[in-house]
Amino acid sequence: MSDVPGIVVTGGSGRMGRMLIETVRGSDAARLVGVTERPGHDWIGADIGVALGGAAIGVTVTDDPLEAFATAQAVIDFTSPAATVAHAELTAQARAVHVIGTTGFSPADLAHLEAAARHAVIVRAGNMSLGVNLLVKLTEKVAAALDADYDIEVIEAHHRHKVDAPSGTALMLGEAAAAGRGVALADVSDRGRDGITGERKRGDIGFSAIRGGDIVGEHDVLFAAEGERITLRHVASDRSVFARGALKAALWGQDKGPGAYDMMDVLGL
C-alpha cells in the first residue's frame, strides 16, 4: 500500500471530512496519511480512527497543516475560504495536489488560488460529482440552443448548515448557461427578488436558494418560455458522490504539471 498516493483530509470532523476519510480508507488506490483540524479542536492529538469511534489506525489529527502536507501526495480540502487559501500556499510548498471542494470564495481569494496554481496542481470545483458535471455540460448546450424567449432560473436546495448562497454548483450552472448564450454571468445574474421588483428582465439568469433540514444537494435549471418549460435536474442523496469525485481528482492530478484544473478536466468532458 505504501506505493499508492498518500492523502491528507482537512477539516476531518466535518460532514464532508468524515465522508472523505471513509472513502480514502476504503480505497485500494490511496492511503490516508493525515487529517487536520483547527487549533483547539477536541480531536487534536487523537488517532483519527479512535476520534471517529473505531480502532486506532496510526494517523494522528494535527493542527499543523504544513507538517501533514509534507507527507502527502494530495490534500483534499472542503473547509472554509480562508482556510483553503492558507492551505493553498502550503500545498504549493509541499508540491502536493490540492483538491478543493470549498465554495464561497471572494475575487481576492480566487486570485490567491490562481497564484498558488503556478507552483502546484490545483483541482477546484463547486461540485465533484459526475452527474453534476454532466448537468453543467447539458446546461450550456441547452442554453446555446434556446434564445432569450426562454427565461433561465437556477434553483438549489441544501441543508440548514450551509453558509453560502448561491451554492458553488448553482454558480457553475449559471456560468454554463451564460457561456451557452455568449454573455458574462456578472452582466445577467439576478440573485435576489424581494418586494416590487418589476417585470423580469429579458436575458437574465435568476438564482433561488433553499435551506432546510438535511438536504444533501438538489439543483434545477429551468428554461421557461410561453407555452412550455424544460427542467434539467440533479439530486444528490449521499455525500459519498462528492467524496468519490474528490478522490478521483486527487489521483488524476498525480502526473499533471502545475496549473488550475476542474472536474471537467478530470472527467475528460
UniProtKB/Swiss-Prot annotation:
Active site: H158, K162
Cellular component, GO, one term: cytosol
Cytoplasm as UniProt keyword: yes
Catalytic activity: (S)-2,3,4,5-tetrahydrodipicolinate + NAD(+) + H2O = (2S,4S)-4-hydroxy-2,3,4,5-tetrahydrodipicolinate + NADH + H(+); (S)-2,3,4,5-tetrahydrodipicolinate + NADP(+) + H2O = (2S,4S)-4-hydroxy-2,3,4,5-tetrahydrodipicolinate + NADPH + H(+)
GO MF term set: 4-hydroxy-tetrahydrodipicolinate reductase; NAD binding; NADP binding; oxidoreductase activity, acting on CH or CH2 groups, NAD or NADP as acceptor
Residues where NADP(+) binds: R38
Residues binding NAD(+), per UniProt: G11, G12, S13, G14, R15, M16, E37, G101, T102, T103, A125, G126, N127, M128
Coiled-coil annotated residue ranges, if any: none
Superkingdom of source: Bacteria
Keywords: Amino-acid biosynthesis, Cytoplasm, Diaminopimelate biosynthesis, Lysine biosynthesis, NAD, NADP, Oxidoreductase
Annotated (S)-2,3,4,5-tetrahydrodipicolinate binding sites: H159, G168, T169
Gene3D superfamilies xrefs: Dihydrodipicolinate Reductase, domain 2, NAD(P)-binding Rossmann-like Domain
Database matches in CDD domains: DHDPR_N
Subcellular compartments: Cytoplasm
UniProt pathway: Amino-acid biosynthesis; L-lysine biosynthesis via DAP pathway; (S)-tetrahydrodipicolinate from L-aspartate: step 4/4
Record EC number: 1.17.1.8
Pfam families the UniProt entry points to: DapB_C, DapB_N
One GO BP: lysine biosynthetic process via diaminopimelate
Role: Catalyzes the conversion of 4-hydroxy-tetrahydrodipicolinate (HTPA) to tetrahydrodipicolinate.
Family indicated by similarity: Belongs to the DapB family.
PANTHER family: 4-HYDROXY-TETRAHYDRODIPICOLINATE REDUCTASE 1, CHLOROPLASTIC-RELATED, DIHYDRODIPICOLINATE REDUCTASE
Name of the protein described by the UniProt record: 4-hydroxy-tetrahydrodipicolinate reductase
Species the sequence originates in: Dinoroseobacter shibae (strain DSM 16493 / NCIMB 14021 / DFL 12)
